[in-house]
């Protein structure tokens, strides 16, 4: 090969490479958005947002101080960040289709966490999201109230207020972290169970921020704080190896007084109906949180004269909490009563109250002799199996879904 031929070959190769680079850059300019776009919200120019293109709609709105509900933190699994994307959102993705009916899809319903912001958009969101705020709160206390449940109490910043309705929830944000269960502050009376189940051995390591939703246990007149009942989500004791512990619950169990926690909210759908119907609350485990919020709100803030009862299921006396609170309410308000059923009472409990699963106790001890159970309103929050059993029982008694209110978070 002579020198001229070699030079020509190099030149041709260089031209080919430059041509490919030009094609890639041209394609990238068409596929990757850049510059600013305008998001028109709720057909109100005052709500317009001008923002850089390129992110997802959920995070883009959050960067502008508009916090849509997202218990999974934008992972596409909770389906809470529902909104209507009228223009500019492209076609619905397969990851979204399972969360909507065909009618909702035709009405342009989308999950904000799955919608890419590439061009000017026209969307509709719940007006309540404009009232959602974010605070850096401080841990007041984080004490065991049951074997695997802690009551986390946060102080909101001075001068701030969480304008929520009973039954509402907020989102907690955990930073990347590594926590060791052996470092948890667990009350002495519960440590034997933690040792027996081998829970202290776990480590939770999280490399990115985590967001989860938790129902509030306080009611609106308990101001200046936010209260939660959080159950540790440790791997099942007889499950396969390698199951990681819950990211958020592990972090919250590690919190100590003085620690900072980022909170956004309030959100909610699990609200009391404004009727005069009898209210029957059914709870179990950490599902206590919205039950407490609702019941205290009805009796102490609203001075409701509606007939109200609370039916709570626990394993043993050790798993009962807020007992003095409810006993005091029962003494103070003639229209309120509460009942506990223990599914597995310990010999030392010397328990002479109801035993068994709470849905069976509610049926046998109250509803089967109730003149009109279908006219009552039922509010429930607890473990999934409890929720399903209660709903099946209510359906068998002719209770319509419109009178069954379920909070899926607290259990």
UniProtKB/Swiss-Prot annotation:
GO terms of biological process kind: sodium ion transport
2Fe-2S ferredoxin-type domain segment(s): 35-129
GO annotations of cellular component type: plasma membrane
Residues engaged in binding [2Fe-2S] cluster: 72, 78, 81, 113
Free-text cofactor note: Binds 1 [2Fe-2S] cluster.
EC number: 7.2.1.1
Domain FAD-binding FR-type: 132-273
Protein location: Cell inner membrane
Catalyzed reactions per annotation: a ubiquinone + n Na(+)(in) + NADH + H(+) = a ubiquinol + n Na(+)(out) + NAD(+)
CC cofactor: [2Fe-2S] cluster; FAD
GO MF terms, alphabetically ordered: 2 iron, 2 sulfur cluster binding; electron transfer activity; metal ion binding; oxidoreductase activity, acting on NAD(P)H, quinone or similar compound as acceptor
NCBIfam families according to UniProt: nqrF
UniProt similarity note: Belongs to the NqrF family.
General function of this protein: NQR complex catalyzes the reduction of ubiquinone-1 to ubiquinol by two successive reactions, coupled with the transport of Na(+) ions from the cytoplasm to the periplasm. The first step is catalyzed by NqrF, which accepts electrons from NADH and reduces ubiquinone-1 to ubisemiquinone by a one-electron transfer pathway.
Name recorded for this polypeptide: Na(+)-translocating NADH-quinone reductase subunit F
Species whose genome carries this gene: Psychrobacter cryohalolentis (strain ATCC BAA-1226 / DSM 17306 / VKM B-2378 / K5)
């Amino acid at each position: 090969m002579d020198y001229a031929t070699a030079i020509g070959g190099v030149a041709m190769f260089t031209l080919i490479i430059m041509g490919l680079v030009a094609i890639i850059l041209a394609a990238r300019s068409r596929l990757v958005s850049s510059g600013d776009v305008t998001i028109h919200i709720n057909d109100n120019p005052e709500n317009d947002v001008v923002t850089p293109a390129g992110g997802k709609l959920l995070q883009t709105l959050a960067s502008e101080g508009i916090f849509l509900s997202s218990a999974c933190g934008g992972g596409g699994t909770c389906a809470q960040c529902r909104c209507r994307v009228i223009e500019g959102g492209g076609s619905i993705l397969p990851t979204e289709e399972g969360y909507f009916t065909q009618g909702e899809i035709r009405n342009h319903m989308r999950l904000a966490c799955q919608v890419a912001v590439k061009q000017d958009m026209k969307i509709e969101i719940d007006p309540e999201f404009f009232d959602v705020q974010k605070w850096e709160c401080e841990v007041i206390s984080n004490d065991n109230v049951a074997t695997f449940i802690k009551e986390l109490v946060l102080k909101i910043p001075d001068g701030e207020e969480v304008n929520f309705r009973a039954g509402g929830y907020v989102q907690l944000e955990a930073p990347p972290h590594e926590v060791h269960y052996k470092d948890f502050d667990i009350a002495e009376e519960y440590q034997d169970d933690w040792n027996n189940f081998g829970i202290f051995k776990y480590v939770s390591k999280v490399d990115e921020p985590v967001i989860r939703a938790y129902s509030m246990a306080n009611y609106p007149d308990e101001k200046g704080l936010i209260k939660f009942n959080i159950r540790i989500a440790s791997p099942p004791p007889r499950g396969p190896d390698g199951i990681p512990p819950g990211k958020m619950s592990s972090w919250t169990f590690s919190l100590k007084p003085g620690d900072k926690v980022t909170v956004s909210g309030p959100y909610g759908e699990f609200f009391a109906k404004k009727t005069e119907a009898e209210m029957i609350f059914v709870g179990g485990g950490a599902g206590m949180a919205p039950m407490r919020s609702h019941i205290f709100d009805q009796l102490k803030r609203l001075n409701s004269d509606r007939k109200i009862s609370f039916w709570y299921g626990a394993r043993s006396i050790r798993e009962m909490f807020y007992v003095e609170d409810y006993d005091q309410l029962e003494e103070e308000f003639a229209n309120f009563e509460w009942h506990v059923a223990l599914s597995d009472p310990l010999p030392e409990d010397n328990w002479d109250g109801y035993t068994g699963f709470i849905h069976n106790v509610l049926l046998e001890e109250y509803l089967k002799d109730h003149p009109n159970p279908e006219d009552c309103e039922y509010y429930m929050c607890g473990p999934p199996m409890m929720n399903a059993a209660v709903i099946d029982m209510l359906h068998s008694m002719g209770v319509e879904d419109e009178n069954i209110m379920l909070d899926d978070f607290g259990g």
